[in-house]
Structure formats: C-alpha cells, structure tokens
C-alpha cells in the first residue's frame, strides 16, 4: 500500500543527463558502471542493456584510452540509456567522447590536470550541451590537499570539490553535479553533509569501493540511507565488487526502504520460528527470483503464523498468514475467501501477484535480457 515519504529533500539545481533530469524535484536516479573492457563493444553493450532492463536510469563507462574512446562511439550508437564517460588523467579523451555524443563527463579533480585542461573540457561540454560530474574520491586527492590534511578527511574532500566548483563558477558553467566519495561510510556521510551546506548543485551519492555484495550493500545502505533520510542526494551509485546488476537492485532497495522511490515488490517477511505453518524462507527466496520482472510497486507480506500475520496483511497490498494446513490470503487489507495450501504457497501467491499486475498495467512487466 502507498506510504508516502515524509523526507524533505534539499533544494538543488536541476541538470539533464541525456533525457534524464537530475536534481530539483526529479526522482532520485539510480546508476551503475560497466566492468567490461570498453574496447569489447559487444560485451559492454550487452551489460548496458542488462542494467537498463533492471531499471538503471543511466550507466557510466570507463574510457581510459583513445582506443576506448573510439569504442565508446560504437557503444553510444547501440545504447538507448544515457551514458556517462569516466575520465581520468587525459583530458583529451573527454574532448573526444564529447564529439561522440556522451551524455555526461565525469572528471576526477585529483588527476585531470591543471586549470587550462579543465577549461578545455568545460568549453567542450558547453559547446555540446553536456553536463559534468566533479567526482572527488578519498583515494585520489590532489597532492597539496593530501599534504595539508595528512589523510582523507571530510574537509579535505570538500576542499577538493569546492576548488573545482570555483573553477566552473569562474567559467560561468553551471551544468554540473558533485560527488565526494570515500570508502569509509562515516567519512563519506560527513563529507556530503558539509558539502550540501555550501552548494546547491545536484549531489551524486556513493560509498566508493564499498566491498563485496553483502558487506558493500550493508555499508552503502547505512551511508546512503543516512544521507537520503536527511534529504541529501539527487542520484546514487552503490559500488560493489559484484555483478553491476546487483548495484541497481540494491540502489532501488535503499530508496524503497525509505519510501523515496519504489520499483518492484517490497516483501515483508518474518525471520521464522517454530510457529511457521509453511516454509517462509523458501517462499520469499523463490518469489524474489521469479518476480524480478515486476516493476509495479507493491507491498507483499509473507508471515508464517497468526501472531503478526493479520496485522502486516492489513498494511499490505497482498498478504499471506500461516494457518494450520491452509493459510489465509489478504488483498488490500481484506481477508479473502481464498485459502492457500501450505504445500503450494509459492505458485499460488505468484499467480495472485501477477493477476494484480495484469489488472493494473501490463507496462509494469519488463522483458528479461
């Protein structure tokens, strides 16, 4: 059921990444980054399409060489989703991909070079109507900032960001977003909190190099959740040492948990105990996998007994409450005459969910690729 968020978002300027708005009152977008060799055009395009299929709003692609820039030209032509070029060290690569229709340029203040090079990138971005992300990272701060602070601190990250914000301001360029990422969640949170008080540009959130699928998801949920709950953030990436598709899933789960942006099914399930009347864990695991193609927001409660089951079902779009031999089924908080055989809960509940989606809108089902 609909539970609108009470979070008040920070007011930020809106920019466009391709046809996707970022900032202002636009939905908070979810993005990922390819981990294929960019020169392998087929593999990179295939991964971009997989990311698009699970809901990515935009995708970043690393462009480390001029050969990769030439490959990016083909990749862009074969992609429907906005693409961001990740540029480090060689500013001339940014100029090249701008010619090839890139939707956004990510530059790293720690290695992109002097102000003359930044001016060249900005002039090119302006000519091609391309926004820029100033992407500060705690692991690659400028040498003088590292020397000043000794180690990455919130103020160090923000100083790096503001130095480059000042350059863009002096160049009268305002089509940019900013990130101040760190691998330490608390450091990242403090950095974004500090930066949010000083600029009104859209903020790209992320805990960089967060870790593997489990630990990285937890670290990202804690850090990004803290910021999002304070209204900070306009777009996000969950950085995982895992399949990039998982980054999109976790990103939407974070937004869904805060009732900021819902996509797909929100399962409410008990941790189980000896009172369960059917196998809750197997049911949830099976349905999460089977129903990945559903994009329609929906709360589904799966509770193994009558202690909390009826109460959770009252607050869900669909719900099942464990009972002896057969379990009770609820829709829109109302108990239905249907009762589920406890040995066939998975198939029966999947059928009910798909029927509800079909009655609402077939566009809420995506094709798997």
UniProtKB/Swiss-Prot annotation:
Positions with a binding annotation for [4Fe-4S] cluster: 270, 273, 305, 312
Highest classification ranks of the organism: Bacteria, Pseudomonadati, Pseudomonadota, Gammaproteobacteria, Alteromonadales
Catalyzed chemical reaction(s): (2E)-4-hydroxy-3-methylbut-2-enyl diphosphate + oxidized [flavodoxin] + H2O + 2 H(+) = 2-C-methyl-D-erythritol 2,4-cyclic diphosphate + reduced [flavodoxin]
SUPFAM superfamilies for the chain: Dihydropteroate synthetase-like, Nitrite and sulphite reductase 4Fe-4S domain-like
PANTHER family: 4-HYDROXY-3-METHYLBUT-2-EN-1-YL DIPHOSPHATE SYNTHASE, 4-HYDROXY-3-METHYLBUT-2-EN-1-YL DIPHOSPHATE SYNTHASE (FERREDOXIN), CHLOROPLASTIC
GO molecular function, one term: iron ion binding
HAMAP family, sorted: IspG
Role, per record: Converts 2C-methyl-D-erythritol 2,4-cyclodiphosphate (ME-2,4cPP) into 1-hydroxy-2-methyl-2-(E)-butenyl 4-diphosphate.
EC number: 1.17.7.3
Protein name (Swiss-Prot/TrEMBL): 4-hydroxy-3-methylbut-2-en-1-yl diphosphate synthase (flavodoxin)
Cofactor info, note text: Binds 1 [4Fe-4S] cluster.
Cofactor field: [4Fe-4S] cluster
UniProt xrefs under InterPro entries: Dihydropteroate_synth-like_sf (IPR011005), IspG_bac (IPR016425), IspG_bac-typ (IPR004588), NO2/SO3_Rdtase_4Fe4S_sf (IPR045854)
Keywords: 4Fe-4S, Iron, Iron-sulfur, Isoprene biosynthesis, Metal-binding, Oxidoreductase
Pathway annotation: Isoprenoid biosynthesis; isopentenyl diphosphate biosynthesis via DXP pathway; isopentenyl diphosphate from 1-deoxy-D-xylulose 5-phosphate: step 5/6
Domain of life assignment: Bacteria
GO biological process: isopentenyl diphosphate biosynthetic process, methylerythritol 4-phosphate pathway; terpenoid biosynthetic process
